[in-house]
């Protein structure tokens, strides 16, 4: 039988990994699509994408409840017609992590694409490549470090997410409780042993994430200097 502490660690990793993969795919597609649209609609989309950077976690959590709760705009439909309840599930943790990491990943990919020389794309089009082929064979390989850096930042942010997740997913041990929530619960109940255990775990993971990010940044900087 898996111990509760191990379940908490595995759940936190699962939420962080899945949300990071999802936000990577969505961010690449969003940047690619919005890059071809210079209308006001693009500005509105980018404002919505970056909104979570400028509002508190509790406000974000409440907004998500209004949307995904059983009486929410989307949640009511899911519950009525498909008997799906997002709130107080581990999927709520993934959705919250996705929302809070989307600005990090989106802006990282956007910066990468903005730095590319348009000559590459023109050469691809002259060679008969479709826009999707240009994205897959030219754009993505050239911005892979931006994507990796964004993934590292997104994973780290998802690992430490607390406020909005607490409101949408709840703090249910063995079901939705993540490492950050476990530290909060343990400290509230005076269980310093458990709080210190999870503190060490999250710090170790954070240091590993920072080492990977610094390595990617150093490699990118070295490549720029070589040019």
Language model: regions and residue ranges:
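Membrane-helix interface segments
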Residues: 37-45, 73-74, 89, 119, ...
């Amino acid at each position: 039988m898996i111990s509760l502490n191990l379940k908490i660690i595995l759940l936190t990793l699962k939420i962080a990994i899945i949300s990071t993969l999802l936000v990577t795919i969505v961010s690449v597609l969003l940047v690619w699509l919005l890059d071809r649209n210079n209308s006001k609609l693009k500005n509105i989309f980018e404002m919505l994408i970056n909104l979570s950077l400028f509002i508190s976690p509790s406000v974000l959590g409440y907004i998500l409840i209004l949307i995904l709760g059983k009486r929410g705009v989307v949640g009511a439909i899911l519950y009525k017609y498909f008997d799906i309840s997002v709130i107080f599930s581990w999927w709520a943790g993934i959705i919250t992590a996705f929302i809070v990491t989307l600005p990090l990943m989106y802006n990282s990919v956007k910066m990468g694409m903005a730095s590319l020389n348009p000559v590459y794309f023109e050469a691809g089009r002259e060679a008969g490549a479709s826009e999707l082929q240009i994205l897959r064979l030219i754009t993505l390989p050239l911005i892979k470090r931006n994507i990796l850096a964004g993934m590292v930042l997104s994973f780290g942010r998802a690992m430490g997410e607390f406020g909005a997740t607490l409101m949408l997913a709840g703090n249910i041990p063995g079901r939705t409780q993540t490492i950050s929530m476990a530290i909060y619960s343990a400290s509230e109940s005076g269980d310093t042993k458990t709080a210190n255990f999870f503190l060490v775990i999250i710090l170790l993971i954070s240091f590993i994430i920072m080492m990977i990010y610094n390595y990617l940044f150093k490699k990118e900087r070295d490549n720029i200097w070589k040019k």
